[in-house]
Amino acid sequence: MDIIKGNLDGISKPASNSRIRPGSRSSNASLEVLSTEPASCKVDTASNLNSGKEDHSESSNTENRRTSNDDKRESCSEKIKLAEEGSDEDLDLVQRQIIPECSDEHKLEELDSQLQDAIQKMKKLDKILAKTQRREKEIKKQGLEMRIKLWEEIKSAKYSEAWQSKEEMENTKKFLSLTAASEETVGPSHENEDSFSSVFHTQIPPEEYEKQMQKLSKDFTCDVERNESLIKAGKKPFSNTEKIELRGKHNQDFIKRNIELAKESRNPVVMIEREKKRLVELLKDLDEKDSGLSSSEGDQSGWVVPVKGYALAVTQHQQLAEIDIKLQELSAASPAISSFSPRLENQNNQEPDLDGEKNMEVTPGEKVLRNTKEQRDLRIRLREIDEKLRMMKENVLQSTSRLSEEQLKCLLDECIVKQKSIIKLSSEGENEDIEDVIPMFPQLSRSIISKLLNESGTKVQKTEAEDADMLESAEREASKGYYLTKALTGHRMSEALVTEVENMKCLQFSKNDIISDTKDYFMSKTLGIGRLKRPSFLDDPLYGITVSLSSEDQHLKLNSPEKTKADEQETKDAAEECKEP
């Protein structure tokens, strides 16, 4: 085969070697003619799959399909042969036609298989529905049979002696009268009725479907026969319009019924006027039957046996009377309780009347009302007693002298104010004492203090001889009586020593030496006296203070204890004066 025109880039090499003429174009692409074997394999696999899914009953359909597939294959092979003989353009057209035909075949096969599966499922479901419907029908028939037997037994036992009590007879009569309509419906004529409960309101049972179709065909033929003359005259039939009018009437009745129901939607039980009339008729029948039974029997055994209500015993009346007497004795002065006594008398007077009325025949309703009234009166009396007791307690509490809460608060406030004033006075006195004790001395610099120390050192050396002479002369002139008087009278010697220290001004000897000398001297004098007490100068505050005459500060400390002692005495006196009032 020689290539004259066209590009064959998208085509593979040919099966047979092609001869190329020197005048023709040379192309790298080649043409390959495919055989029919792979297509047949694909079709066979698809047919095998479809045959596996289908039942044995559908084998004939598969054979027909195979024949059609074989015909298609043959047509494809013929087209390929023609393409081999023809030109390149013919090959392109043939290939374009072959590809969509094959794809359409596969799609159709898939759709057929899906439809067949769906049909099989529908058949299975139809069988299941038919079984369930048969079962329901059987159960309903059994229920109807049992109901018929029950009604027959009730009717047979209505006038028998099996009913021992009259209440059971009345109940059965009422039950039969209420369910008379349902009893009438149940009968041999209604046993064979088809009680089909449809899932959808438009569903029709399969058994009646053929009957309805026959009826429709008959109606259609009748309408056609009636309207043949009209059809010939060129007029339209009115059978459909008549049917539409009937449906419209039915719909209007339905609308009216809905309107009537909507009017009485507020009522607990929605009923139409027709239903109300029926109910009134049934109730009238029941009232007539009840009146006939009561007149025929003449007994009151059906009524409830009258029972006496709650009544106070004689002892309880006596106890209440005693309580009232005690209350009158306790609160004779109060007018509220005095008004309570006439009620007791009235009630006691009414008691025999009540007893007389009880002997009379009373219906159950009146007795219940009487009992409720008596209970109400008793509750009112108990409330009045509680109120009077509460009033008595309040009077007793008010008679006793008790301070109110406001008075107690005022007293507490006054006490707190007094305590605060005392504390303030004592604190102010202590502060004043401390301020008085603290000396207001001028602060000296270190240079001045050093000068004073140097001057004191020179003066001490000059006065040592004079002091020694003065002490010796004092010891010689002193006598025993003089020192004893000094020891007994007080701390005169201490004052003398203070004056001597002030006069000496910065002597360089320690106070410990002075204290040791004076202590030894006075103790030696006092040991000789048996009954004398400890001298008062030993308790002097100056006796325990260390004196260092090397600095002026220590010299100034000697004057401060005397002032503190005086201040302490003044504070003590002030505190005693505050306590006395």
Swiss-Prot record:
Renumbered to this chain, region (Disordered) spans: 1-77, 338-370, 553-581
Keywords, sorted A to Z: Coiled coil, Phosphoprotein
Keyword Transmembrane helix (UniProt): no
Q: Which InterPro entries does UniProt cross-reference here? A: Fsip1
Q: Does the keyword Lyase apply?
A: no
Q: Where is the composition biased (Polar residues)?
A: 14-30
Q: Which domain of life is it from?
A: Eukaryota
Phosphoserine occurs at which residues? 87
Q: Which PANTHER family match?
A: FIBROUS SHEATH INTERACTING PROTEIN 1 (PTHR22012), FIBROUS SHEATH-INTERACTING PROTEIN 1 (PTHR22012:SF2)
- Can you name this protein? Fibrous sheath-interacting protein 1
Originating organism: Macaca fascicularis (Crab-eating macaque)
Q: Lineage of the source organism?
A: Eukaryota, Metazoa, Chordata, Craniata, Vertebrata
The gene is FSIP1
